[in-house]
A protein has these predicted regions:
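Soluble extramembrane domains flanking the early transmembrane region of eukaryotic membrane proteins
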Residues: 1-162
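Generic recognition of cysteine residues
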Residues: 11, 103, 131, 186, ...
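Structural signal for hydrophobic/aromatic residues that build the beta-strand cores
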Residues: 44, 124-126, 183, 255, ...
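Residue-level marker of positions within ordered structural domains that often coincide
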Residues: 49, 131, 188, 260, ...
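Helix N-terminus capping/helix-initiation residues
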Residues: 70, 157-158, 195, 305, ...
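Hydrophobic alpha-helical transmembrane segments corresponding to the first two to three helices
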Residues: 145-282
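Generic detector of multi-pass transmembrane helix bundles and their immediately adjacent loops
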Residues: 227-420
Length: 420
């Protein structure tokens, strides 16, 4: 369980956390993760602490407390816990002990407040441990993670996220420029070449540009104050949701040229498309829960797994749609063998686009995940750079393949389906 939490928990968006734990019986709670490369500090304040004993003896205050665990010490702690199932992690020499409940002020305050400097650069995980079986803990917790700049000001972003505000802003400018260029092409091109999909594609660019712009604002505000601005955060989530839904919509519509919406005969296949979007909506709900909470909630790991599962199913559904569209077009064009131009072997565009989409899914879902797993914590921004670069290149390739040209291969295929 410890390894699962550490692997799935990203560094927080807001590095000032205020949370309430109520009647929690978990033996270990991951509060937050943070990576330091300089003068790191962790500030912890607990209040209104109460411990309720289970069926056993009275809880021992020294068996409840907070500690920091670096990634380098994770393996050693796991070995200790495997060798002795009753081992209390607070007794481990590989953890950085902060304080136990023995340090709390007498009731009714039952509080503690202290700031700890961290000398060794590393990525740390803040844990709360309860080594009293069957006892439940309630408390109010306030944590702050920050590094001190040379002028004494605080930097609340982890070292691996320090470049994210500039990175997101740069990609936002690129998407706005791409949008302006596409609108210019639509304006100067022959309007008879415009299809409905060409009006939907710039909506994707606009939503993506705005989501990145507000993501940069969220990170910038979190870096200065330790918390994300509520308006920027909500706006980012809205535009991020719209951009994800539009991306899947455009990919499916472009990849099948709306042939799956062909009436009556293909009614059963239309259902599949209307399953993809609800799956993405549910996946985004899971993303909002993960984004706005933290690993301290009891179902946090479950929400992460739901997010990954729904996104994976959505990608598989899109790939299935493409395979079905290719089979449909092969069957339709086989009836038009009298015209050499109708031979499916000469229509390579849909096959190429299928490979492009498959490569995009593999790189953004699996490649980025592997990169985030193996990369050092101070270079976490590289995984964001890779993901945004792949997405931008994918959009450029998709827009180029289905640009405004007269009688491209895809238009001919669309006419065949409509006439059929």
């Amino acid at each position: 369980m410890l390894a699962l939490l550490l692997l799935q928990a990203p560094c927080s968006t807001a590095e000032i956390q205020t949370l309430t734990i109520t009647s929690d019986t978990r033996p270990m709670i991951l509060i937050e993760k943070f990576g330091f490369t300089g003068r790191g500090h962790v500030s912890i304040s607990v209040s209104s602490v109460s411990v309720v004993a289970g069926t056993g003896s009275q809880p021992e205050p020294s068996r409840l407390g907070f500690f920091l665990l670096s990634e380098e010490s994770l393996l050693q702690v796991l070995i200790e816990m495997q060798q002795n199932p009753n081992f209390c992690v607070l007794d481990s020499h590989y953890t950085n002990h902060l304080f136990t409940f023995r340090c709390l002020s007498p009731p009714p305050a039952s509080s503690f407040n202290h700031t700890y400097p961290l000398i060794l650069p590393a990525r740390y995980s803040l844990f709360f441990a309860n080594c009293n079986p069957e006892s439940s803990v309630s408390m109010k917790l306030h944590t702050e993670f920050f590094t001190l700049n040379r002028d004494g000001s605080r930097n609340y972003l982890p070292s691996g996220h320090a470049l994210l505000p500039s990175l997101f802003f740069l990609f936002s400018i690129l998407y706005f420029s791409f949008l302006a260029f596409w609108l210019y092409l639509c304006h100067v091109s022959n309007h008879s070449l415009l299809h409905r999909i060409h009006f939907l594609m710039p909506s994707l660019l606009l939503a993506k540009a705005l989501s990145l712009l507000f993501a940069a604002a969220v990170k910038h505000h979190a870096n200065l104050t330790g918390i994300s601005h509520a308006w920027d955060d909500v706006t980012f989530l809205v535009f991020d949701f719209v951009s994800v839904v539009l991306l899947f919509t455009v990919v499916v519509l472009v990849g099948t040229r709306w042939t799956f919406l062909h009436p009556l005969r293909q009614r059963g296949k239309t259902v599949l498309f209307f399953v993809v979007l609800p799956l993405q909506i549910l996946a985004h709900v899971a993303f909002v829960v993960v984004h706005n909470t933290g690993p301290y909630i009891q179902d946090w790991v479950t929400w992460n797994q739901i997010l990954l599962l729904l996104d994976f199913i959505s990608c598989c559904a899109v790939v299935f749609l493409f395979l079905w569209a290719i089979r449909l077009l092969r069957r339709i064009t086989s009836k038009a063998q009298s015209e050499p131009a109708m031979n499916l072997d000469r229509f390579r565009l849909i096959k190429r686009f299928y490979l492009v989409v498959l490569g995009y899914f593999l790189m953004t879902r699996f490649g980025v995940f592997v990169l985030r797993t193996i990369i050092a914590y101070e270079y976490e921004w590289v995984s964001n750079l890779a993901e945004e670069t792949v997405t931008l290149v994918f959009c450029i390739v998709m827009f180029y393949m289905f640009r405004l040209v007269e009688k491209d291969e895809y238009s001919v295929l669309a006419e065949i389906v409509v006439n059929e």
